[in-house]
Amino acid sequence: MPKNMETLQRSYMGPSTPNHNLFNNATELPDDLNFSTMDVPYDGSMPMNMSSDSLMNLLEDRSKKLACAVDTELARESTASEFVAGFSADSPQAQLAETGAETGAAGGSKRKASEVDSDSDSDDSSKGKKLVNKPKIRQRYKKATIQNRTSLTEERQYSTEICTVAAPDQIAKYFAQDFSAHLNEVKSECQMSANRFSDYISETGYYVFVVKKGDRKPFEVVFAKFVNNATNEYTNNYYMVDNRVFVVSLNNVKFMVSYKLVREQGIDIPPHVNLCNDAQAERTPLNCYFEPVKNAFQATLINHFHLDMFYAQTTFVTLMQAVGENKTNMLLNKLYQMYQDRSLFTLPIMLSRKEPVNENAPQNKNHAFSYVAQIMKYSKNLRFPQGDPTQQVMDRLEEIVTQKSSLTYKYSSVANLLFNRYGRRDNNADALKKVKKEDGNRLLVEQYMSYNENDDTSHNFIVLQFGGVNDERLTIAKRGKEFYWIAGEIKDISVDDLIKKYARNVHHVFRIINVNRRESTTWHNNLLKLLQLLLQNLIRLEDVQRYSDKSDTKFVYKKV
């Protein structure tokens, strides 16, 4: 029984955004995260001096009031929706839009997607364009993009193998549990909770939290608001906290983490993070700069600031409210039973295996992946052509790197690029056509590096793809004692951690930044062409550094 039935009743009758103070209290973490509350009785769950009959009468009275209030609200919303739908269908604007859509279809004209899918709220944006009354389901990923920069003056799949940790009969028994016998007793409430649950699942807004430096604690996590645009909310109301922000997105919860706080906490910030420098941030205090984080850095922020706890509490509160009181009671009882018998930590049941299967792992240091063995065998007597830096190439560097070419990410195509002299067809890489590329994984990278780290004379390279359709790419080229890395964001491995393992060698790292998947593929090919010039000594490292410092380039260069 909730402590405050009036508050619960208002939550069903009010707007979708929860009360700020109530939500802060509901998502507040205890000071000691290791303190166990399972054995502590909850004294505030019911009045201590009430008799059983009085308690039942109170429950019945409050339940009737709640049911009446919910029915009234649902009826009001249903009436309003029907009125709006009828008005829209009969309005001249809707008929005009429908006629315009039919005319456009008959004429076979094409329009850019941006004209139809524009999210702009400005009245001027619709002038001169046809309005199309086209029902469309807006998928969440379209709204998940984080703007790199906003201004206060302007704003007011991964291919995996699935493994299980429980026997199939246990899994089937868990998922086949029948709740109907219990739920039929409260059928009317189940229908209302189903409506709430459907609205909850289809909601596309975000719960926004701000992670900032605390007055009495090292940091604090504050609930901001339930909004459709997290960056606008932060820019309008929290820009004074810090105008440089790391954005941690966990489904429909977004954490806006202060850049200054991360730096003060001594957390290592990856070198490819592309937030503005201190001088620019101070010079433009009304501009907010946002950097979405993922993979290893995201895991670090989640662990350090306990964001997983805030996400779990937020999800529990909103989900339990959506399914209703009776269903919540059954679910919590079931969860507590599973916690008691420890089955909660072996179910459910399906885990994504990020590492290669065991049979692909090398059994000892003398075992080699077929891919690595072929590279070492067929590149044994090959060397990258060597020339002299020329002013003509330096002056045309950007043009050479960004011009279209027939280069693909096949091993033979990259081999022809790197081992044939620039501007010629020498057929130096014919032997490498026999190399069969394999899918990338961490063990394969480590084995390639281990075979090459103590060889000071060989020239070779490896190309790897991770993540199936996501097409995350990694290229490593070796010339003598030096390694050249081309990479973007790779979910399965950390390039920086790998480089630290091979400190004996010199590493040149080209990190692709601030691009989508398609641009990442294009820029990876561009950097391969840049690497050709560098390996063949046609340009100097100073030229590479100067090119990477340009404002419109999509990569950063670092020597380790």
Curated annotation (Swiss-Prot):
What transmembrane ranges does the database entry give? Answer: none
The protein's matches in Pfam families, at most eight in alphabetical order, are given as: TATR
Q: What InterPro entries does this protein map onto?
A: TATR
Q: Which UniProt keywords apply?
A: Early protein, Transcription, Transcription regulation
Q: Which GO terms describe its biological process?
A: viral genome replication
Region listing for Disordered, in residue ranges: 1-25, 99-134
Role, per record: Regulatory transcriptional protein, which trans-activates gene expression from early baculovirus promoters. Can also trans-activate its own promoter, suggesting that it is autoregulated during normal infection of insect cells.
Similarity comment: family membership: Belongs to the nucleopolyhedrovirus IE-1 protein family.
Provide the protein name.
Answer: Trans-activating transcriptional regulatory protein
